[in-house]
UniProtKB/Swiss-Prot annotation:
UniProt keywords, alphabetically: Mitochondrion, mRNA processing, RNA-binding, Transit peptide
Gene (UniProt): MTF2
Cell compartment(s), UniProt: Mitochondrion matrix
Organism: Saccharomyces cerevisiae (strain ATCC 204508 / S288c) (Baker's yeast)
GO MF entry, a single one: RNA binding
Biological role stated in the UniProt entry: Required for the processing and/or for the stability of the CYTB and COX1 intron-containing pre-mRNAs and of the ATP6 transcript. Could be a stem-loop RNA-binding protein that plays a role in determining RNA stability.
Protein name: Mitochondrial translation factor 2
Length: 440
């Protein structure tokens, strides 16, 4: 017989063992729940941080785009105050059209009607006389006709030069290897350019001319202070440091409250010619490109490329995205492309630059088209000359001339990558030409 004590003992053992196992299971379940909660919390925190980062960068680029659009939209209105002579009366506002006459025989000296005309008189010099519109005055229509002639000259392909050789080259290449990368771009004959494009070009010319006038004291200071490329490098570094430490609120307030921003720049430049006047978002991009293009600084091309590379890398590596958006505009990229080609003559470097311009929304202008058009023509003419020389040698060789379908792929460092890079640059050039000719 089984004793009662033994039964109770066994029951108590099983009961205690069962309780221990339940406690372990409950503890494991709590650990898993806690781990899942922590993992979900970490994922939510990471997603929130990622979303905030995207929002910050999106706001920065949107703000830069708005500033750029506002600058282009209001540039014409701001500059017209100096070239059209806005006159305020107590009864109302009346606009009095004035024209700038160059090299006029009768230079009538008269009192200018308002402060804006006095500003132009002081900054223009002795070669400008302000009179009412006459047949000899340079009007908007004359500027438009000159701009149209310049555009047609740049866009017109010279088809008479090596036309037969170029057609023979394309025919042989397509028969032999089917290389589509060497196809010639379609000639732009009888191109009609939109009035909006020519108006933008005219506004930019007037904008650059006005900045030349108001920043003349500071440019004269640079001519005296800069004796070597090291001096210019030190000046560029100091200017970038000042921009990084600028008071953003003060500049925004200055832009909002100032009625004549060019006059403010002129006054600050006259009072302190050694300092670059504010707002730096307007003056710094101009002075960087201007200093690298001044004829007084006759530096070698490699030194100029070193200077512009320093500015370019500083803008790209800085945490402040506005530095890149402000400095690296289309004029800066045009100079960068020009110096890249003068120093290296490698199409792959140009391909990287034009790709970056497309990705970052830097739209090329007529100067970009002019620079790239010359580079593409130089690449093609150079390759054609080498190909024709090789073709003459092949025709003299009896063994090779018997094979009609054979072709030799020759050129200056001409390979598959070169063809692809040149094709990308050509496509970018075509898109720029279409953008300048289409109605917006």
């Amino acid at each position: 017989m089984i004793r009662t004590s033994s039964i109770l003992k066994n029951c108590n053992y099983r009961y205690i063992h069962c309780i221990h196992r339940c406690l372990l299971n409950e503890a494991n379940l709590k650990d898993r729940k806690t781990h899942n909660v922590e993992r979900v919390s970490n994922e939510k925190t990471f997603e929130q941080a990622l979303e905030e980062e995207r929002k910050v960068f999106g706001e920065l680029f949107e703000a830069g785009a708005r500033v750029e659009n506002m600058r282009h939209t209001n540039a014409s209105k701001i500059i017209d105050k100096y070239y059209n002579g806005l006159q305020d009366n107590s009864e109302g506002t009346s606009v009095k059209k004035e024209k700038i006459v160059f090299n006029h025989s009768q230079r009538a000296q008269r009192k200018l009607p308002n402060k804006d005309h006095e500003f132009l008189k002081e900054t223009a010099g002795n070669d400008y006389v302000y009179e009412r519109a006459e047949p000899s005055a340079i009007s908007t229509k004359t500027i438009s006709e000159q701009t149209r002639t310049l555009l047609e000259k740049i866009f017109d392909e010279d088809n008479s030069i090596n036309k037969s050789n170029r057609e023979l080259l394309n025919l042989n290449l397509r028969k032999g290897s089917g290389m589509e990368a060497l196809r010639q771009p379609v000639a732009h004959s009888n191109v009609k350019f939109s009035e909006e494009v020519m108006q933008e070009i005219g506004n930019k010319i007037r904008y650059q001319t006005t900045l030349d006038q108001v920043l003349e004291p500071h440019i004269d200071y640079l001519r005296e202070a800069v004796k070597s490329d090291y001096d210019l490098l030190r000046y560029l570094k100091q200017s970038l440091d000042i921009y990084k430490k600028r008071n953003k609120d003060l500049e925004l307030k200055m832009n909002a409250e100032s009625s004549n921003i060019f006059e403010d720049i002129r006054s600050a430049c006259i009072n302190k010619p050694a300092e670059l006047p504010k707002p730096l978002a307007m003056t710094l991009p101009y002075i960087i490109v201007k200093s690298l293009r001044l004829g007084d600084f006759d530096f070698p091309a490699d030194r100029k490329y070193t200077l512009i590379s320093y500015v370019y890398n500083e803008c790209k590596n800085n945490m402040d995205a506005s530095l890149y958006l402000t400095i690296c505009n289309v004029d800066f990229y045009n100079l960068l492309v020009q110096l890249l080609w003068e120093n290296f003559q490698e199409i792959r470097y140009l391909r990287r630059v034009v790709t970056e311009m497309s990705v970052n929304g830097v739209i090329g202008n007529i100067e970009t088209v002019d620079i790239l058009d010359k580079i593409v023509k130089e690449m093609r003419s150079l390759n054609e000359d080498v190909f024709l020389e090789a073709g003459e040698q092949l025709s003299a060789d009896e063994e090779v001339s018997s094979s009609a379908n054979k072709i030799v792929n020759v050129g200056v460092l001409w390979n598959k990558d070169t063809n692809n890079d040149l094709l990308i640059v050509e496509n970018y050039l075509k898109s720029l030409k279409k953008n300048l000719t289409r109605d917006r």
